[in-house]
UniProtKB/Swiss-Prot annotation:
Residues 363-382 are annotated as: Disordered. GO terms for molecular function: histidinol-phosphate transaminase activity; pyridoxal phosphate binding. This is Histidinol-phosphate aminotransferase. The modification N6-(pyridoxal phosphate)lysine is found at residue 215. Homodimer. The lineage of its organism: Bacteria, Pseudomonadati, Pseudomonadota, Gammaproteobacteria, Enterobacterales.
Length: 382
């Protein structure tokens, strides 16, 4: 083995070539209206009730597991808690995929961490693009299952906001029976709880459901997520999870959020978000620069603009930070807008209202050239 003076040459080749996930915080910005990460716009206050910081926490804090199990309508042995749902995504790859041999499958446009997690572990990323209506292409999935061990499906899907047809989810579970785990990412399910598939766990041993406290529970900064699955899968994941995934303060606050009072507050937030989403969707349709607003079952809206780069930068310059989706398959000229407070939604509309529509596309194209250098550091694509 030849020696190198560059320590980075010692890293795995796939890591050296890896493009990391561009989170909203990594992209940065100096705005005061943050509508790019699907967070709840207002903070929630908690007081720590546990002070035993000199002791290591439980691997799976009992009070958190029991409260989430009760909330989800499942026995505790079917629940695992982790550092956000993102860790749950990784745990499935670590437990089920042989690096350099197995693959995961997902259907873009969708959440970007499935791809990044697989690449990090040296696992093939196999994509089956969604159909024009963003539903699953079942024949194509059936033709691409060779060596696939985990299939990720996000419903409601991020960034499109649509629910996946439940009959199609059942078809994928049947196709994957005995071959692959099917992980349904329900990060946004609190905004449409009737669409959850958690009651399917008794019928599908290969079903896994990913959940989080980051969205409707307004705890994105806490980093607390859940994996729901049959107990055999939970036991496998416990073999590969870190020994202390949740710190004592995180477990304390998570348990409070999952109390009856905390759940009621969450549902009030969901009601507020839905009302603001309806208002924003209606108002966007009256903006000349907006070509289409897509129906959403989540806490964000996807919209197609006449010239999204100009729109993105115009709002950025006014301190309103959105999420650019142009590089996702089928999402040319699309921006994703998190549902903020009513005041924040009104600021978005006030900023969009004077922007020209399709009849002034030449002017917009000229603006795009002006913005081309700055936009490359401003945009997130996932």
């Amino acid at each position: 083995m030849s020696q190198s003076n560059n320590v980075t040459d010692l890293a795995r080749a796939n890591i050296r070539a890896l493009t990391p996930y561009m989170s909203a915080r990594r992209l940065g910005g100096n705005g005061d209206v943050w509508l790019n990460a699907n967070e709840y716009p207002l903070g929630t206050e908690y007081q720590l009730t546990t002070q035993t910081f000199n002791r290591y926490p439980e691997c799976q804090p009992k009070h958190v597991i029991e409260r989430y199990a009760a909330y989800a309508g499942l026995p505790p042995e079917q629940v695992l808690v982790s550092r956000g749902a993102d860790e749950g995504i990784e745990l499935l790859i670590r437990a089920f995929c042989e690096p350099g041999q197995d693959a995961i499958l997902f259907c873009p446009p969708t959440y970007g961490m499935y791809a990044v997690s697989a690449e990090t572990f040296g696992v093939e990323r196999r994509t089956v693009p969604a159909q024009a209506d963003w539903q699953l292409d079942l024949p194509a999935i059936a033709n691409n299952l060779e060596q696939v061990k985990v299939i990720y499906v996000c419903s409601p899907n991020n960034p499109t906001g649509n629910l996946i047809n439940p009959a199609d989810l059942q078809a994928v579970l049947a196709l994957a029976q005995g071959r692959a785990i099917v992980a349904i990412d329900e990060a946004y399910i609190e905004f449409c709880p009737q669409a959850s598939v958690s009651n399917w766990l008794k019928d599908y041993p290969n079903l896994v459901i990913l959940r989080t406290l980051s969205k409707a529970f307004a705890l994105a900064g806490l980093r607390c997520g859940f994996t729901l699955a049959n107990s055999d899968i939970i036991q496998l994941l416990l073999k590969v999870i870190a020994p202390y995934p949740l710190s004592t303060p995180v477990a304390d606050i998570a348990a409070q959020a999952l109390s009856p009072k905390g759940i009621e507050q969450m549902r009030q937030r969901v009601s507020e978000v839905r009302a603001n989403r309806a208002w924003l969707q209606s108002a966007l349709q009256d903006c000349a620069c907006v070509e289409q607003v897509f129906t959403s079952e989540s806490n964000y809206l996807l919209a197609r603009f006449t010239a999204s780069s100009s729109v993105f930068n115009a709002l950025w310059d006014q301190g309103i930070i959105l999420r650019d989706q142009n590089k996702q398959p089928g999402l040319a000229n699309c921006l994703r807008i998190t549902i903020g407070t009513r005041q924040e939604c009104e600021r978005v509309i006030a900023a969009l209202a004077p922007l020209p529509g399709i009849d002034n596309s030449n002017n917009i194209d000229n603006q795009n050239k002006t913005y081309s250098q700055t936009s490359s550091i401003r945009k997130g694509t996932i």
